[in-house]
Curated annotation (Swiss-Prot):
Family: Belongs to the rotavirus NSP2 family.
GO CC, alphabetical: host cell cytoplasm
Entry keyword Protease: no
Protein name: Non-structural protein 2
UniProt organism field: Rotavirus A (strain RVA/Human/United Kingdom/ST3/1975/G4P2A[6])
Keywords: ATP-binding, Host cytoplasm, Hydrolase, Magnesium, Metal-binding, Nucleotide-binding, RNA-binding
Length: 317
């Protein structure tokens, strides 16, 4: 994750701003600079290589002292920065909005995936600039539309029916901020269209998850798509979701946290997010993740969501 101010800076033209991508030499200069505390939140002028990000974001970049940041000296960083600027420059951002826009935290890996989709000649995003910009605006929180299959970050499609598409995420192969844990495996499920879904399509998806992915929990971060994650990573996802939800509320950005379809979501996660929306503390909410919950009734005849160890699938071993 990183703020948009880590990729570009605003330049006032008439009554709105144009956004310009940083070059990596300017960033490198900023990372070596000694800057007064009172200037940490200001864009840094490298003199030689142009404007650089505010020094307060130093930890967002990979250095000898910090291996958890972005590999900003890669070609991919430049591609992501340019893509962000193209999307922002399609909007009219005024002085009252610019600080809020640049402070928004976005998924670096999501944006790299959109670059990969854009460069794939077989992908619809290669052929449609309009759809590409729409996808980026959704990714950076500048659109109220949800991420559907056409505008999704992408990956390897492992399941699809009339209503849903399930993607295996390819973060292990990334250049900008790769996941280093070789055991990482995670999926995302997007809606093909943002419209009511038939019970038949839901049952098809639940059956696929029940028999092929029952080593995983189906959760949501509240943004209109599902995530399929290892049970061992659920607590970590809970911490992140809770922190994001509370920070958004604190900063005045009221978000409509979408609980999605209770028949698909792991019931403990549904209880966790429902409790979070009611205003309970993190400890109270997380206890619900580890409780043995009895399902009131089976959502579909012939399908159970209970995990039986003699029926566990091989996906995820």
């Amino acid at each position: 994750m990183a703020e948009l101010a880590c990729f570009c800076y605003p330049h006032l033209e008439n009554d709105s701003y144009k956004f310009i991508p940083f070059n990596n030499l300017a960033i490198k200069c900023m990372l070596t600079a000694k800057v007064d505390k009172k200037d940490q939140d200001k864009f840094y002028n490298s003199i030689i290589y142009g404007i650089a990000p505010p020094p307060q974001f130093k930890k967002r970049y990979n250095t000898n002292d910090n291996s958890r940041g972005m590999n900003y000296e890669t070609v991919m960083f430049n591609k992501v920065a340019v893509l962000i600027c193209e999307a922002l420059n399609s909007l009219k951002v005024t002085q009252s909005d610019v600080a809020n826009v640049l402070s928004r935290v976005v998924s670096v890996r999501h944006l790299e995936n959109l670059v990969l989709r854009k460069e794939n000649h077989q992908d619809v995003l290669f052929h449609s600039k309009e759809l590409l910009l729409k996808s980026v605006l959704i990714a950076i929180g500048q659109s109220k539309e949800i991420e559907t299959t056409a505008t999704a970050e992408g990956g390897e499609i492992v399941f699809q029916n009339a209503a849903f598409t399930m993607w295996k995420l390819t973060y292990l192969d990334h250049k900008l901020m790769p996941i280093l844990d070789q055991n990482f495996i995670e999926y995302k499920i997007t809606l093909n269209e943002d419209k009511p879904i038939s019970d038949v399509c839901v049952k098809e998806l639940v059956a696929e998850l029940r028999w092929q992915y029952n080593r995983f929990a189906v959760i949501t971060h509240g943004k209109g798509h599902y995530r399929v994650v290892k049970y061992s990573s659920v607590a970590n996802h809970a911490d992140r979701v809770f922190a994001t939800y509370k920070n958004s509320a604190k900063s005045g950005n009221v978000i409509d946290f979408n609980l999605l379809d209770q028949r698909i979501i792991w019931q403990n996660w549904y209880a966790f997010t429902s409790s979070m929306k009611q205003g309970n503390t993190l400890d109270v909410c997380k206890k619900l993740l580890f409780q043995n919950m009895k399902q009131e009734k089976k959502p579909f005849k012939g399908l159970s969501t209970n995990r039986k160890m003699d029926e566990v699938s091989h996906v995820g071993i």
